[in-house]
């Protein structure tokens, strides 16, 4: 159950980052204030809940094991950036993502 909490904390953290990115997207000047307030409010909510879940994780998992698992954030953000904003990702970046996943698998298998 705690590993599910860790994944959920990671996903909420990523959601918060993505909301911040969305807040920077161009909108008409008359809608800008509401747009920014909405997305930054959602970002704060996601990041706040992620922090609470992270504290639960740290109560149950050694920080040396738990913290590297947050590297999943790099993977989630890359996938979301491609899907949501059609951002280009170089082969070198994908290679880095593969190394991150490999590192997480290696570290996770020690538990």
Curated annotation (Swiss-Prot):
The chain crosses the membrane at residues 38-58, 61-81, 88-108. InterPro entries: EamA_dom (IPR000620), Flippase_ArnE (IPR022883), Small_drug/metabolite_transptr (IPR000390). GO terms for molecular function: carbohydrate derivative transmembrane transporter activity. One of its GO terms (biological process) is lipid A biosynthetic process. Belongs to the ArnE family. Heterodimer of ArnE and ArnF. Translocates 4-amino-4-deoxy-L-arabinose-phosphoundecaprenol (alpha-L-Ara4N-phosphoundecaprenol) from the cytoplasmic to the periplasmic side of the inner membrane. This is Probable 4-amino-4-deoxy-L-arabinose-phosphoundecaprenol flippase subunit ArnE.
